[in-house]
Amino acid sequence: MEYTHQYSWIIPFIPFPVPMLIGVGLLLFPTATKKIRRIWAFPSILLLTIVMFFSLDLSIHQIQNSSIFQYVWSWTINNDISLEFGYLIDSLTSIMSILITTVGILVLIYSDNYMSHDQGYLRFFAYMTLFNISMLGLVTSSNLIQIYFFWELIGMCSYLLIGFWFTRPIAANACQKAFVTNRVGDFGLLLGILGIYWITGSLEFRDLFQIINNLISKNEMNLFFVTLFALLLFCGSVAKSAQFPLHVWLPDAMEGPTPISALIHAATMVAAGIFLVARLLPLFVLLPQIMNTIAFIGLITVILGATLAIAQKDIKKNLAYSTMSQLGYMMLALGMGSYRGALFHLITHAYSKALLFLGSGSIIHSMEALVGYSPAKSQNMVFMGGLTKHVPITKFFFLVGTLSLCGIPPFACFWSKDEILNDSRLYSPIVAIIACSAAALTAFYMFRIYLLVFEGYLNVHFLNFNGKKNSSFYSISLWGKKQVKLKIKNENFLLVLLKIKKNEITSFFIRKRYLHRVNQNIKNISRLFFGIMDFGMKKTACLYPNESNNTMQFSMLVLVLFTLFVGAIGISFSQGIDLDILSKLLIPFIDLLHKDSKNFVNYYEFFTNATFSLILTFWGIFIASFFYKSVYSYLKNLNLLNLFEKNFIKKKFSDHFQNIIYNWSYNHGYIDVFYEISFISSIRRLVKFNSFFDKKRIDGITNGIGITSFFLGEAIKNVGGGRISSYILLYILDILIFILIYINFVFIRY
């Protein structure tokens, strides 16, 4: 065991030869390196697999011994300054190492085929491997300086991958947005690190926790400064894990390739913020104000991410807001003191979300044959629908990820999310209500994605399609035309994707009303959550999506197995609550909510809470099915729907309310607009003023002196007439004038 720990420092550096050799090869032998580019996937996966087995061995020893191993090298510069570097192996390191390597390996396998036709294939694998190296270095760091170094390296890799297709202006802007937003959090993190060093004189985790604990217990320090610096440390996690209000970069980060979206959202960048809070939790628990702040930020992020996800058209942005909401659950759990619940959900969510992103990549990959390689079309759920018969395997994989994220047993996220919801009831009733509401919204927006993508018909082909029966109507206006508003008097019940005329619009949530003719039962309908417009084309080629190949399906299959069984690590199969694998791995861990509870599981309470959670989940699924499922395919008599709508729905109020929700969600809560008005526009005006002042004033003075000197020289250059005697005479006169001035000055002074 000691031998294994002594060489743990090598974990982050095992995959390092891959990006180094790719870089050298592209620099010295670019043609030959590009010819054998597909070979580089093998060493990337192989070396990361070695790290995975190393991490598994450490985890097994951790479960058996519950030990903490730290090794530090000290470099003394002088008597006052010394730099210490080392590695820390504990339960948190073991969990994160396994998570990073398993997800990283599967994403690399998937990427080998997904990126095979991309010119930046080698660059992509170099960035991805360096990304994994950075995250492994972060989780094995023993002090805050190392944390900050790898923290910035993670950020750099994420910016490179978000802007991977940098020739696209949208991708370049998304990269810039991620960089600027994270700079705010990273600056706060740096100030917090410097402040903690000023207070404690140490940056080693174990030392600074003990020092601060002693200082607080003896009342020998100002709590204001400790709280301030702890809050600054937390700012780094707020930006990196896309917590409110620094979450705005996350949806735009979807401009990168889909495999990197899976890695960022599952095991690397956004997980880094959760890891940092978990690592610093022994410090934060000493400061109740900080714990309450963490819980508050997490709670806002939970509900904000859920509400912003319900009206997005882009499948990846939908999943991005889903990630934001789930990260809010983890942050909320950490703020409540539920260390185990937060890490449990981090594990289960990572595999489920990786599965969903790889599934969405498979869907996008199949849609590109129909709509081209524009992300605005291939990722747009408006063009999808009816993919069940075209990509059935992908549908099954995506459904498993959807069920897991919704919290349906026996899938992984059910166990972890249910634990957080139970802990929220112990923490505060208000927090519990909001957290449970977000759980219902999660089921709604996830099944919204599933139904829009896989149910119904393939929308891209339906410019003017009618079903065989009048009661089965399906026609859609898809792209590029302006909206035409029509005034109507009667308002009837809404069905998804009904027949519309050219240049008219329908969508997936009631917002505006347009006239439609469908039978005599429904004369006009209202608009649902996002608009679908016309291509302006008369004909479409009858192409259909194809299933992904075996390489991509293999990665998704393994993630399905993880999604099915990884939840078992947190299930107690005996009566003791500390006898499950996760609890053994996390010993010792912080639990502020169950200090006085008995060490036995109350199964009645568990089933009661689980039943309540499932009721909320199924309610969200029902609402999603009500709005988005092709109900017209199953109902022969629409009079019943019209009767229900006429008698029970107050249409005016309903339309107004749904319009508010639509605008809020589709416009990202107006937060980007607020930042644009309050910060960005002001900064731009300041920059323009500085540019004007620099060019017209500073440069103007300098250039004016130069131009004046030039013209003065031109004016007097002919005074001497070109004769040496004239130059000598002028020179003598200048000397005499200088002597006279000097003598005058001396006499006046004395």
Swiss-Prot record:
<feature type="transmembrane region" description="Helical">
    <location>
        <begin position="185"/>
        <end position="205"/>
    </location>
</feature>
<comment type="similarity">
    <text>Belongs to the complex I subunit 5 family.</text>
</comment>
<dbReference type="GO" id="GO:0042773">
    <property type="term" value="P:ATP synthesis coupled electron transport"/>
</dbReference>
<keyword id="KW-0150">Chloroplast</keyword>
<keyword id="KW-0874">Quinone</keyword>
<comment type="subunit">
    <text>NDH is composed of at least 16 different subunits, 5 of which are encoded in the nucleus.</text>
</comment>
<keyword id="KW-0520">NAD</keyword>
<feature type="transmembrane region" description="Helical">
    <location>
        <begin position="9"/>
        <end position="29"/>
    </location>
</feature>
<feature type="transmembrane region" description="Helical">
    <location>
        <begin position="354"/>
        <end position="374"/>
    </location>
</feature>
<feature type="transmembrane region" description="Helical">
    <location>
        <begin position="396"/>
        <end position="416"/>
    </location>
</feature>
<dbReference type="Pfam" id="PF00662">
    <property type="entry name" value="Proton_antipo_N"/>
</dbReference>
<comment type="function">
    <text>NDH shuttles electrons from NAD(P)H:plastoquinone, via FMN and iron-sulfur (Fe-S) centers, to quinones in the photosynthetic chain and possibly in a chloroplast respiratory chain. The immediate electron acceptor for the enzyme in this species is believed to be plastoquinone. Couples the redox reaction to proton translocation, and thus conserves the redox energy in a proton gradient.</text>
</comment>
<feature type="transmembrane region" description="Helical">
    <location>
        <begin position="219"/>
        <end position="239"/>
    </location>
</feature>
<dbReference type="InterPro" id="IPR001750">
    <property type="entry name" value="ND/Mrp_TM"/>
</dbReference>
<dbReference type="InterPro" id="IPR003945">
    <property type="entry name" value="NU5C-like"/>
</dbReference>
<feature type="transmembrane region" description="Helical">
    <location>
        <begin position="728"/>
        <end position="748"/>
    </location>
</feature>
<feature type="transmembrane region" description="Helical">
    <location>
        <begin position="327"/>
        <end position="347"/>
    </location>
</feature>
<feature type="transmembrane region" description="Helical">
    <location>
        <begin position="606"/>
        <end position="626"/>
    </location>
</feature>
<dbReference type="Pfam" id="PF00361">
    <property type="entry name" value="Proton_antipo_M"/>
</dbReference>
<feature type="transmembrane region" description="Helical">
    <location>
        <begin position="554"/>
        <end position="574"/>
    </location>
</feature>
<dbReference type="InterPro" id="IPR002128">
    <property type="entry name" value="NADH_UbQ_OxRdtase_chlpt_su5_C"/>
</dbReference>
<dbReference type="GO" id="GO:0015990">
    <property type="term" value="P:electron transport coupled proton transport"/>
</dbReference>
<keyword id="KW-0618">Plastoquinone</keyword>
<keyword id="KW-0813">Transport</keyword>
<feature type="transmembrane region" description="Helical">
    <location>
        <begin position="147"/>
        <end position="167"/>
    </location>
</feature>
<dbReference type="InterPro" id="IPR018393">
    <property type="entry name" value="NADHpl_OxRdtase_5_subgr"/>
</dbReference>
<feature type="transmembrane region" description="Helical">
    <location>
        <begin position="125"/>
        <end position="145"/>
    </location>
</feature>
<keyword id="KW-0472">Membrane</keyword>
<protein>
    <recommendedName>
        <fullName>NAD(P)H-quinone oxidoreductase subunit 5, chloroplastic</fullName>
        <ecNumber>7.1.1.-</ecNumber>
    </recommendedName>
</protein>
<dbReference type="InterPro" id="IPR001516">
    <property type="entry name" value="Proton_antipo_N"/>
</dbReference>
<keyword id="KW-1278">Translocase</keyword>
<keyword id="KW-1133">Transmembrane helix</keyword>
<keyword id="KW-0793">Thylakoid</keyword>
<feature type="transmembrane region" description="Helical">
    <location>
        <begin position="39"/>
        <end position="59"/>
    </location>
</feature>
<dbReference type="GO" id="GO:0008137">
    <property type="term" value="F:NADH dehydrogenase (ubiquinone) activity"/>
</dbReference>
<feature type="transmembrane region" description="Helical">
    <location>
        <begin position="89"/>
        <end position="109"/>
    </location>
</feature>
<feature type="transmembrane region" description="Helical">
    <location>
        <begin position="290"/>
        <end position="310"/>
    </location>
</feature>
<feature type="transmembrane region" description="Helical">
    <location>
        <begin position="267"/>
        <end position="287"/>
    </location>
</feature>
<dbReference type="GO" id="GO:0009535">
    <property type="term" value="C:chloroplast thylakoid membrane"/>
</dbReference>
<feature type="transmembrane region" description="Helical">
    <location>
        <begin position="427"/>
        <end position="447"/>
    </location>
</feature>
<keyword id="KW-0934">Plastid</keyword>
<keyword id="KW-0812">Transmembrane</keyword>
